[in-house]
Amino acid sequence: MDISKVDSTRALVNHWRIFRIMGIHPPGKRTFWGRHYTAYSMVWNVTFHICIWVSFSVNLLQSNSLETFCESLCVTMPHTLYMLKLINVRRMRGEMISSHWLLRLLDKRLGCADERQIIMAGIERAEFIFRTIFRGLACTVVLGIIYISASSEPTLMYPTWIPWNWKDSTSAYLATAMLHTTALMANATLVLNLSSYPGTYLILVSVHTKALALRVSKLGYGAPLPAVRMQAILVGYIHDHQIILRLFKSLERSLSMTCFLQFFSTACAQCTICYFLLFGNVGIMRFMNMLFLLVILTTETLLLCYTAELPCKEGESLLTAVYSCNWLSQSVNFRRLLLLMLARCQIPMILVSGVIVPISMKTFTVMIKGAYTMLTLLNEIRKTSLE
């Protein structure tokens, strides 16, 4: 990549390509696909999302024991959350696309090779996370296929209600297993995108904040400039900071409610999967299949909490940069403008879900403790039922 030409939106290209395949990012109406995209979107989402959700939900309602209920809940609840996330992306699509223009505007404000290197490092980090999640999901799907192949009796990757008799005939079983696995592969693609796109946006916001901090820290050093010129440069940096804050608030609006539901969903999934693995009678392949699912669901929330802390960390660096610039030798008007920027930088860039819950590693720890508490409660219920 040419260091003189940095495009932050490059990190988002794969995400929006997948969203187009998922049926929520229509192309131009002049193309053949664009004219028929609505029908395509309906067929895709009904086939791969609604049908699989109905089968998971009906299977959950037909549970006749605590073990089967836990096994069904740990796939039904996350899938329901992913459908809500997909609807939310469709609802906020216009605002998210418009943020690309703001990112390109910030790209044009980069002033030196060091700043461009910061943005490039952020893009590479986002792409690395995307590839890592892809590999993890691919391993999970492959393990599920191995589990199906190695099973001594007809089975599917995850507990699902099928409205026809698929166990008595080899041909019916093979057709059902292929359809079910194909649907889960499509959903794995959806999970890949919904798990990684928030982190990509948050990383881009954080690296642009870091680049701005580098620019601000250099203010007043080097060759002396007229007071009017210094004020104009500072005003430009204040505008850059306002753009970053607009991006951050846009992300918060896009992610707030679904992130709140994700904490609850992940805690429930951790609790139910652990209960099923600890107290259910499962073979080694089934155990590994559910264990990989647990790792994927936990990693998704861990990644969200980690990337949500990056803008806050770089916001603190920007505050330090304001103090570090050579403001002592500047004019009174410059200092007044700097005080305005300083006041805004003192407000931490903390992403909040559901109005009150901060998205952070501390919240992730609280979620783990909540899952353990629920697991303890389920264990007490199990002991009571055995007595």
Swiss-Prot record:
Q: Does the keyword Transmembrane helix apply?
A: yes
> Primary place of residence?
membrane
Residue stretches spanning the membrane: 41-61, 72-92, 128-148, 172-192, 255-275, 286-306, 337-357
Q: Which Pfam families would you find in this protein's record?
A: 7tm_6
Its biological purpose is as follows: Odorant receptor which mediates acceptance or avoidance behavior, depending on its substrates. The odorant receptor repertoire encodes a large collection of odor stimuli that vary widely in identity, intensity, and duration. May form a complex with Orco to form odorant-sensing units, providing sensitive and prolonged odorant signaling and calcium permeability.
> Any further remarks?
The atypical heteromeric and topological design of the odorant receptors appears to be an insect-specific solution for odor recognition, making the OR/Orco complex an attractive target for the development of highly selective insect repellents to disrupt olfactory-mediated host-seeking behaviors of insect disease vectors. Odor-evoked OR currents are independent of known G-protein-coupled second messenger pathways.
- The protein depicted here goes by the name Putative odorant receptor 19b
Q: What is the lineage of its organism?
A: Eukaryota, Metazoa, Ecdysozoa, Arthropoda, Hexapoda
Q: Which gene encodes it?
A: Or19b
